[in-house]
A protein has these predicted regions:
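Glycine-rich phosphate-binding loops of nucleotide-dependent enzymes
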Residues: 2-250
Length: 250
């Protein structure tokens, strides 16, 4: 078996008697499009916080590209190639789209503060940022302030900023959250354009988006993995319908 892009072994987290993650063995393959779903309170956010280092585990290990990152600081996990978007938009809303992505790339390169001073290297960073926007279909909005964009496009910019960090693994935390149903298609289109070598874990409540994009789905319930498999198997599993997809027998 090849090395996973991201893997947990026996990952656990408890707050006193409350267990939010119970011995989770999870594997994100390289280049995968993998979704994590589950009802409210299933432990999805806690699991992602453990992956990113926002929470310290009570037990178990986390490996990123075979390296043990269990006790690594959040900032160092980002530098190792683990990037996350958030449910709540965290962009610099008064800056233009290009500036937001440029700042992310500059942070990755360790020259964020130096952007205030002109230098040839800064031009290369700006060119990289614009090229990324072109790839993702956002070049037309490059010079627009983020707060002038529709909310759906703001979420696209958030993904572009995460990609500016050059991640090996991208954690998409509810990318469709707060987006009107008529705008969710732009999220799908952009995610379909993501580079194939980036491993993607999507945490999402929008089942249409999940089943369109993911080739593997993990269902989390009460801090444990209930089932994992391809979309057809998940959609047809009676346990999933009962706890999550709304087909509870009466």
């Amino acid at each position: 078996m090849t090395d996973a892009a991201l893997e947990t072994r026996g990952l656990s987290k408890s707050f006193g008697a409350l267990s939010v993650a119970s011995a989770i063995d999870f594997r994100l393959e390289k280049g995968a499009r993998h979704a994590l779903i589950g009802p409210n309170g299933a432990g999805k956010t806690s699991f992602v916080n453990l992956l990113t280092g926002a929470l310290r585990p009570s037990g178990g290990t986390i490996h990123l590209d075979s390296a043990d990152i269990t006790h690594l600081a959040q900032s160092l996990r980002v530098k190792r190639g683990l990037a996350r978007t958030f449910q709540i938009n965290t962009l610099f809303r008064r800056l233009c789209v290009l500036e937001n992505v440029t700042l992310a790339i500059a942070e990755r390169e360790g020259v964020a503060g130096a952007l205030l001073r002109p230098a040839g290297r800064h031009r290369a960073i700006i060119e990289e940022a614009f090229s990324l926007l072109e790839t993702l279909g956002l070049a037309d909005a490059a010079l627009q302030p983020v707060n002038a964009l529709a909310y759906g496009r703001q979420r696209l910019v958030e993904i572009a900023v995460a990609l500016g960090l050059a991640p090996k693994v991208l954690l998409l935390d509810e990318p469709a959250a707060g987006i009107p149903s008529g705008e969710s298609g732009v999220i799908v289109t952009m995610l379909e354009r993501l580079p194939a070598d980036i491993s993607v874990l999507i945490i999402e409540h929008d089942m249409d988006l999940v089943f369109r994009l993911a080739t593997t789905i993990t269902v989390l319930v009460q801090g444990r993995i209930l089932i994992e498999g391809p979309p057809d198997a998940i959609a047809g599993d009676p346990r999933v319908r009962e706890v999550y997809l709304g087909d509870r027998k009466r």
